[in-house]
Amino acid sequence: MSIEINKEYLKNAQYKKSDYLEARIAIHKFTTSKETFQEWIWNQIKIEKPGKILEVGCGTGAFWKLHLSKLPAGSIVLMTDFSSGMTEKAQSNVSGDNVQFEVADVENLSYEDSDFDLVMAHHILYHASDKDKALKELKRVCKIDGSVTITTNSERHMLKVYETGQKLDPNFPTDRIIDTFTEEIADTVLPKYFDNIAKRVCEEYLHVTDIDIMLDYVRSGVEPRNIKVSDDFYDRYREIVTGEIKDKGYYEIMKRSPLYICT
């Protein structure tokens, strides 16, 4: 079940500071893949010539922190997020003469038509309250011969985390923001906006060995929403994670995220 999108909640609670997002990013270092998700995306989109790039929903700047130096000479990157806290964090992580930062809303972009060679909307469309408007805006600001890249998650992505939480406490939230724009929804919706779509899928497992990082991830979906769980909820969750780590050497979680390269 999906959660109703409330931009004020996202701006003033979930993403006011970078702490919760960083907790949700940290867990992915336990990937069994030889490359991180950000590296996988870079290898898929293959930026081979200079251009003007817009990233909508830059978050902490994780993608360009890794890849800005790899861009062809003459490239320009505009990193945006609807949270000023996020753009400030991104600016502290990424620097260069060819990068700029702005606060922007994917549903109401202030840029000219056909302004960018590449428009990136990675794991952000489920935050849009009006998906139709957001997708039209992404397409509008992209050049006719440019590309819009979109990533999201499958309904099955990290599902074990939520199923475990729900078993421990019925108050644990299973109405995930991501469920408003999953892979399964994107497969149906995106062809209505783009004539050509190349879909790539990154499916892998996390083998988590740090219990505190695991619990920080769990908290990041509970605390910003002021949801009250039982006093011993995190202790019991810790016991489950600890038990699996003791038995297998790690706590295993499946993740699945698609990339859509749209033209």
Where are these regions (language model features)?
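Conserved class I S-adenosyl-L-methionine
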Residues: 1-51, 62-66, 86
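A short SAM/SAH-binding and catalytic strip from SAM-dependent methyltransferases
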Residues: 117-130
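Conserved Class I S-adenosyl-L-methionine
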Residues: 4, 34, 60-62, 180-184, ...
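A short acidic, Gly/Pro-enriched loop at the edge of an enzyme's catalytic core
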Residues: 107-118
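Helix-to-beta-strand junctions that scaffold the AdoMet/dcAdoMet cofactor pocket
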Residues: 72, 128-129, 142-143
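Class I SAM-dependent methyltransferase SAM/SAH-binding core
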Residues: 54-108
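Conserved catalytic/acceptor-binding region of the Class I
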Residues: 132-133, 139, 145-208, 225-231
